[in-house]
Swiss-Prot record:
Any one Gene Ontology BP term: L-proline biosynthetic process
Disulphide bond pairs: none
Catalyzed reaction equations: L-glutamate + ATP = L-glutamyl 5-phosphate + ADP
Natural source organism: Cyanothece sp. (strain PCC 7425 / ATCC 29141)
The EC number(s) this enzyme carries: 2.7.2.11
Compartment(s) where it occurs, according to its Swiss-Prot or TrEMBL record: Cytoplasm
Identification of the protein by name: Glutamate 5-kinase
Phylogenetic placement of the source organism: Bacteria, Bacillati, Cyanobacteriota, Cyanophyceae, Gomontiellales
Amino acid sequence: MTQTLVVKIGTSSLTHPKTGDLSLSTIAVLVETLSKLRRQGQRIVLVSSGAVGVGCGRLGLSERPRTMALKQAVAAVGQGRLMRIYDDFFTTLNQPIAQVLLTRGDLVQRQRYLNAYNTFQELFNLGVIPIVNENDTVAVDELKFGDNDTLSALVASLVEADWLFLLTDVDRLYSADPRQQPDAQPISVVNSIEELAQVQVGDRGSIWGTGGMATKITAAEIAGEAGVRTVITEGRSPVNIERILAGEALGTQFEPQPRPINARKRWIAHALVPTGKLYLDRGAVQAIAQLGKSLLAAGIVQVEGVFQSQDAVLLCDRAGQEIGRGLVNYNSQELEKIQGRRSEEIPTILGYSGAETVVHRDNLVLS
C-alpha cells in the first residue's frame, strides 16, 4: 500500500557537532534509504535542516549567526551547497529530487497553501522526492516557522501524510535529557500529549540547530491532529525508518488523533499567524467551547490589535487564556464599535449590513 512519508533530519544529525561539516556517511545512508522506499512505491518528502550550519562550515564561522541578516546570508551559502550534495548522492541512484523552499507566508494565504499542495502532488506523480527547507534568506521574524520540526509537521499536514519521522540526536523521547540524567526512562508510545506533562524536555538540542525536544513534541501534536503518526528516532541511523515501517518498536511513536481535524481547520489552527485577540465573556466561551456555536458580537468584551476582515485572531477568555482561533468577518475598527451588541443592532451601528456572526463555527477551531 502506498503511503506518504515526511522525513525531517536535523542539523545535529547531518553535521559533525564541533565543526559543522556535513556527515557524508549519514547523508549516504539517508539517501539510500529514501530512494529504496521510493522504488517500493512510497511517496517521500525530506525536510532537511543544515543550511545555516553548512554555511558556517563553508565560511569558517565558529558559531551560529546571531543577527537575522547574517543568518540569512549564511543560509544562502549553505543551502546551495547542501542541495548540490543531495543531488550528487540521489543522482547516483537515479532518484530525481526537487528543492522546495517555503516561508510561513506561503501557508498563510489560502490560495498559496492550495498551490503548495498541488505542487507536492505533481512531484509525487512524477516520482520526485521534494527536499524542503525554510526559505531563510527571505523569511522575516513575523512569518517564520522558527524551526524545521514545526515546518515538517505543517508539511505533513499539508500533504496529508501517513507518517512523520523526526530524526534527531537521541534514539527516542525520555522522561528527562539522558545526556544530563543517566537514569532517565525511555518512552516508547505516546497516546496523548497530555501524558507528557511531567517530561523534562529541555531546550536547544545542539549549538548548530534551533530545535530541542519541546519543538518535536509540538510537531507531533500538530501532525497528530492531521491523523499523522509521528516517530522520534535516531538520526544517524536512517535505516530505522524501514525497520519501523516493518513493525519494529524503535524510537518513540505518537499515536494520531482518532478523529483528525479537517484540512481547513488545520490551516486555521497552525498555518495562520494571528494578528489580533478577542476577549470573550463567560457565556461566549461556553457557547464556543462546549456547544460548538459561532461567535457573536454580543460575547466580545475587548478587541486587541489591528486586523482586517478574514484575518486570523485568537479567541480568549477574560483572563487572556486562549480557547480557540478563527477567521473574523469584521475588521478591528468595526468590532470595537459592535462589541457587546446584539446582531440585529449591527446594521444601525455600522450603517450597513454585515455578517450575523463575528467568527462562524466553520472558521473556528478550539485550542
